[in-house]
Each structure stands twice: as C-alpha cells, then as structure tokens.
Amino acid sequence: MSEASTVKLQEPRLQDRRALLVAGLRRHYTPETMNEIPALWQRLPFGKIPSQLGHMAYGVLFNQSDPTGGFDYLAGVEVSGVSAVLGDLTYVKIPAQKYAIFCHRGHVSKLKDTMAAIWHEWLPASHRSVSHPTAGSPQMIEYYAENFDPQTGLGDIEVWLPLEA
C-alpha cells in the first residue's frame, strides 16, 4: 500500500484568493535534498522581516518542471511591498487565483503524505486541472496559520493547489 493511500483527505474547499507578495528564503531542491527544507525554515528571520503582514507563513513550491524532479521552494511571509525585501531574502508574487484548499491533519513531517494524496488520488478523481504556471508562479502553496508551532510541528496547515478557471 502506498503512503498516499494511508492519508484520508477531506474534500477541499474551493476558494478564490487575492494576490499576495511573499518574501523569504529560496532554494532549489531535488527529491534527494527535500529533507533539508526544515533547515531553510530555521534560517528564516520570522517576525523580523520589514513590512511583514501578520504571523502566518507560506511555503511556496514553483519551477517544478525540472527533469530531475527538482523544484524551487520559498519559505516566507506576506509583505506589503518589494522595497522591504533585504539581504538574502527574495520574493515571489502569487497571483489572484482559484485554489483547492486542503487541511493537513497531524505533524508537519507528514505533510508530504498529504501532498502525495492530493496529486495521486484527489486530482485524478476530481477531473479538475491544475493551473498551468507561468515561469516563477506557484504550483503549490503551504499555508501555516498563526497557531502553527514550529517547535512542536503542530497547528493548522493548509495546502493550496491552483486550479484552472
């Protein structure tokens, strides 16, 4: 039995989301190095980023067309403007979009299982299409609510999958 089939996904809510500007740390990962993503989060100066809006965090996955299975990942926060991005921080503009929004249940270390269930079970069964990304636009977004505790790895986490209109 695959790991994806052990995850019981609730039906997602479909929601139109406004555009966001997310600033943070960005790195390229491969399937072999994706276990290093938590180290990127540990380096993020959360709460100290100029013009940070709120206490939510975003993990933005994009440029996943790499033939090696690689992808770019940005660990960041919403900011009010680009001028606030300093040092080794970078930003990504997330366009207004319709999303299928899934609630992840459990520890953050099991998030990959939820994502696998979304891609390999829900998406084929839903007969929906993922939005074809333009260069640099997100292919999936992790949303960490204010109650997410990075020390325990628990709290509200959502996975946003951009859909074709």
Locations of regions flagged by a protein language model:
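A solvent-exposed interaction/effector surface
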Residues: 1-165
